[in-house]
Amino acid sequence: MTLDPDQTGEIPLGPVTEWTATVVGVHRLREDTTVVRLIGEFVPFAPGQSVEVRTPQHPNMVRRLYSALPPSLDGKLEFHVRAVPGGWCSGSLVTDTRAGDEWRITAPAGWLAVHEAAAELILVADGVGLAPLRALLLDLTRRPHPPRTHLFVGARYPRDLYAADMLALLGNELPWLTIVPVVDSDTDPAHPDPWYDQCRVDIGFHPEELVPGPLAAAVSRFAPLSHQQILVCGGTTAVETTVDILVDTGTPLENIRYEAF
């Protein structure tokens, strides 16, 4: 699946520039997932875009991450990082990031953007692919008439819905937003996750609200989506499967924008 940038509405980038930001908060939410908050120079990216980051632990390695916040003049950034099995750089970001670290940020890129004329929006997030879609949601709150939006959030197990409390609050506060949590299994694995046990909160999704996965199948139950704009972000397999099944069930490819990592 390949989209021509001219057809996707990719946001043109300016000359290469580097900005710096300092880590002010590190929140380990799961054994493999960390939320990193930074404040620094204003980074001129668009909501939904990713940036390249270099960290003091690996100054010569580049990692592309999505901001979970829209750009702000006060320089606030938030990244959701999940350790990839066998990926020691992502694992180090989860375990070794500390407050006070200075990150170098370059190269905003991407085309996950909401059409101004969109009346109905379908957002599909696999894992930490939620980050750019959350940034877009927060940006939509600035519109006088946001589009009716369904956000599908996919995870393997219920405890992998790492932002369940935040999503439940958003769903309650925004009348135009419907959250659809999707899990491959409705039962958590037997082995414990100490980080989940430490930060578990009462706010979240009730078991009866969880939709059986996989994510692509859950989204396809609403197909064909002939009039909606669809944005998909997450792991390569989940994204490709979702786009393929949507197209196969009658959704026009031109309605879909997607990015995978």
Identify the role of each PLM range.
Residues 4-101, 155-157, 182-186:
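Ferredoxin-reductase
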